[in-house]
């Protein structure tokens, strides 16, 4: 059952975890050391004191700002939006989903092609999970992997807002709290957000709405077929997920208050 990807929503992540048994641990350790050094190098070269985190909610479509005032961090399928990329010229891309990014679907394949484009056009720095290194090592060419930093997850109660000091993240179920906040907190004192709309609590048929410009809508049915177990979730699941997400965001906001970080959303949000 644990690897039955047609019935079990956790099967894809289980299969990824199994893939770690087929790679040299010394290789992984070298990659982690390189990734940690890369983060410190990035920190030493930062010239702007504030960062803009961009989510894929509908509010990002009408967002108007002078991107040149910020270092820009994007996530997930925003990589498909070439017009937005041309304006924002993102410095960072974060992703870490077990099916949409390292998976065998055409959706994941198109996503990875867009990651290649992003690196070629903007030399964007990529942060993702060390969990997925064994897969990405085999699907990305070395010239692209040079822009990757792989971050390990650690089972801990505390959220880590300083990866320069301790290079790990606490596992969470959303890219904002999994990677975007940890990296942003580690490098910047002023953090502004756009496109993290969330949802009204009664709108519980899915996680939340996404901007059509930032989603591979034409490939969704294919990935739902391949990973059918992943999508066997009911309203109760989405309610619990959303409540957990709100609580996790609150914990990060609390951390900002004790670490002198400024956080604010520039677009309408049910989360902030």
Predicted regions and their residues:
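Metal-ion/cofactor- or nucleotide/acyl-coenzyme-handling active-site neighborhoods
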Residues: 1-272
């Amino acid at each position: 059952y644990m690897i039955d990807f047609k019935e079990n929503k956790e099967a894809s992540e289980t299969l990824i975890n199994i893939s770690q048994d087929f790679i040299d641990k010394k290789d992984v350790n070298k990659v982690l050391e390189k990734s940690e050094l890369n983060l410190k190098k990035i920190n030493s070269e930062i010239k702007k004191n504030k960062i803009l985190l961009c989510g894929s909610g509908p509010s990002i479509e009408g967002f108007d700002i002078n991107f040149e005032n910020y270092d820009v961090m994007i996530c997930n399928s925003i990589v498909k939006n070439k017009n937005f990329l041309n304006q924002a010229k993102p410095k960072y891309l974060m992703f870490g989903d077990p099916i949409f990014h390292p998976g065998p679907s055409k959706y994941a394949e198109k996503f990875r092609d867009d990651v290649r484009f992003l690196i070629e056009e903007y030399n964007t720095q990529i942060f993702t999970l060390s969990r997925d290194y064994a897969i990405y090592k085999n699907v990305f060419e070395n010239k692209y992997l040079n822009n990757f930093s792989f971050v390990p997850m650690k089972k801990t109660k505390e959220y880590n807002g300083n990866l320069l000091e301790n290079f790990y993240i606490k596992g969470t179920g959303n890219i904002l709290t999994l990677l975007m906040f940890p990296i942003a907190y580690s490098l910047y004192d002023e953090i502004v957000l756009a496109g993290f709309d969330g949802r009204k609590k009664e709108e519980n048929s899915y996680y939340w709405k996404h901007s059509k410009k930032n989603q591979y809508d034409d490939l969704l049915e294919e990935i739902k077929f391949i990973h059918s177990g992943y999508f066997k979730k009911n309203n109760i699941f989405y309610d619990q997920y959303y409540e957990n997400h709100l609580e996790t965001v609150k914990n990060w906001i609390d951390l900002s208050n004790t670490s002198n970080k400024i956080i604010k959303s520039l677009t309408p949000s049910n989360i902030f």
